[in-house]
Design a protein with these regions (language model features):
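Short helix-perturbing small/polar motifs within transmembrane alpha-helices
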Residues: 1-60, 64-136
């Protein structure tokens, strides 16, 4: 991390901080009794850890995104973030990346999941209102 510019370090730490705050806040709302959530977390961990490497060192193809999307649509953004965090922590243990890389990855996934949850809730709320108007 020493070789990074001050601006890059600020961006990384900002993303980690915002992601950590959102993760803590969202996971307080998690339904821990949902067994399907643990199955998805295990599938996500396997998919995240065993990604397909591309033609060069900087390219890989992760099928974990399908698991994250399914968790988001099926169980909501809080559950999707749980699956992302578990998947990335397992990958971190397996591949032993530097701490700031995986922390940044978790934060960089957490922020858009939170924002997508806000959009999804707004769109869903609007469609329920339209549905209610149509039934009158």
């Amino acid at each position: 991390m020493k070789e990074l510019s001050v601006l890059a370090k600020a961006y990384i730490f900002g993303t980690i901080s915002i992601g950590l705050g959102l993760t803590i806040w969202m996971l307080t709302k998690l339904d821990w009794s949902n067994t399907g959530l643990y199955v998805l977390a295990a599938l996500g961990a396997v998919a995240q850890t065993l990604k397909v490497e591309g033609p060069d060192d900087k390219t890989n193809y992760s099928i974990a995104w399908f698991v994250y999307g399914f968790a988001f649509i099926g169980f909501g953004p809080v559950s999707a973030l749980f699956v992302v965090v578990v998947s990335h922590l397992v990958e971190w243990i397996w591949h032993k990346y530097p701490w700031y890389i995986q922390s940044f990855n978790i934060g960089a996934h957490g922020i858009p999941i939170f924002l997508a949850g806000l959009v999804f809730a707004a769109v869903s709320r609007g469609s329920r209102q339209l549905h209610g108007i149509g039934s009158v």
